[in-house]
């Protein structure tokens, strides 16, 4: 594929971003867990204080998907802070449609994310990858990523909303 553009997402891209989030969730066998709406994406990413940033990969008209979509990939990220090393870019979701893989789109998205991280003086980029997702693990490792689970023994935890509400109400 000769031409594609990686650009910051706009509010008008929210329906495509949600479509790709659902495709990623399906790829990860978790599609029933997507509760987000287009309205949520719009309010959370394009309001006065955005909770996330997003890059999209757009192809020209001659390379549209069979359904007529021009947005074929995305990366959703935000900034966080580590008290030991400072600013971090956290890559929350990263997906390129299967028919558009192998054309350098994913590599270009990662390059743009790296440029954003360097411009913002981030010390590193963090992200999660499912243990079974060898293609993605290899993609990241070829670009210098290290597996903190095996190298440093970190475990990821979460506290669901139900328990957050319970703790918030405690006296």
Swiss-Prot record:
Where does the record place the catalytic residues?
A: 140 (proton donor)
Which Gene3D superfamilies does this UniProt record tie to the protein? 3.40.630.30
Q: Which residues bind acetyl-CoA?
A: 94-96, 102-107, 133-136, 140-143
- Can you say where in the cell this protein is located? Cytoplasm, Cytosol
Q: Which GO terms describe its biological process?
A: angiogenesis; polyamine biosynthetic process; putrescine catabolic process; spermidine acetylation
Catalysed reaction(s)?
an alkane-alpha,omega-diamine + acetyl-CoA = an N-acetylalkane-alpha,omega-diamine + CoA + H(+); spermidine + acetyl-CoA = N(1)-acetylspermidine + CoA + H(+); spermine + acetyl-CoA = N(1)-acetylspermine + CoA + H(+)
Detail which positions bind substrate.
27-28, 92, 126-128, 152
User: PROSITE patterns under this entry?
Assistant: GNAT (PS51186)
Write one Gene Ontology MF term: N-acetyltransferase activity
Pathway per its UniProt entry is: Amine and polyamine degradation; putrescine degradation; N-acetylputrescine from putrescine: step 1/1
Q: Which domain of life is it from?
A: Eukaryota
Tell me which GO cellular component terms the UniProt record holds. Answer: cytosol
Domain N-acetyltransferase: where? 4-170
Its Enzyme Commission number(s) read 2.3.1.57
Q: Which Pfam families match?
A: Acetyltransf_1
Top EC class, one word: transferase
Key words of the record:
Acyltransferase, Cytoplasm, Transferase
Q: What is its main location?
A: cytoplasm
Q: Which family does it belong to?
A: Belongs to the acetyltransferase family.
Q: What does this protein do?
A: Enzyme which catalyzes the acetylation of polyamines. Substrate specificity: norspermidine = spermidine >> spermine > N(1)-acetylspermine. This highly regulated enzyme allows a fine attenuation of the intracellular concentration of polyamines. Also involved in the regulation of polyamine transport out of cells. Also acts on 1,3-diaminopropane and 1,5-diaminopentane.
Q: How does it assemble?
A: Homodimer.
Family matches, as PANTHER family: DIAMINE ACETYLTRANSFERASE 1, DIAMINE N-ACETYLTRANSFERASE
Please report the name of this protein according to its UniProt entry: Diamine acetyltransferase 1
Please state the gene responsible for encoding this protein. SAT1
């Amino acid at each position: 594929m000769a031409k594609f553009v990686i650009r910051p997402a706009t509010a008008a891209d929210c329906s495509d971003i949600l479509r790709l989030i659902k495709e990623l969730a399906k790829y990860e066998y978790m599609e029933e867990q997507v509760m987000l709406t287009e309205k949520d994406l719009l309010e959370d990413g394009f309001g006065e204080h955005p909770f996330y940033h997003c890059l999209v990969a757009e192809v020209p008209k001659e390379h549209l998907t069979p359904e007529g979509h021009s947005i074929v990939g995305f990366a959703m990220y935000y900034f966080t802070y580590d008290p030991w090393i400072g600013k971090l870019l956290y890559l929350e979701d990263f997906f390129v449609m299967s028919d558009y893989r192998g054309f350098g789109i994913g590599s270009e998205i990662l390059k743009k994310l790296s440029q954003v991280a360097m411009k913002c003086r981030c010390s590193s980029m963090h992200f999660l990858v499912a243990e079974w997702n060898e293609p993605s693990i290899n993609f990241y490792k070829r670009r210098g990523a290290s597996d903190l689970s095996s190298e440093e023994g970190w475990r990821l935890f979460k506290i669901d909303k139900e328990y957050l509400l319970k703790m918030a109400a405690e006296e």
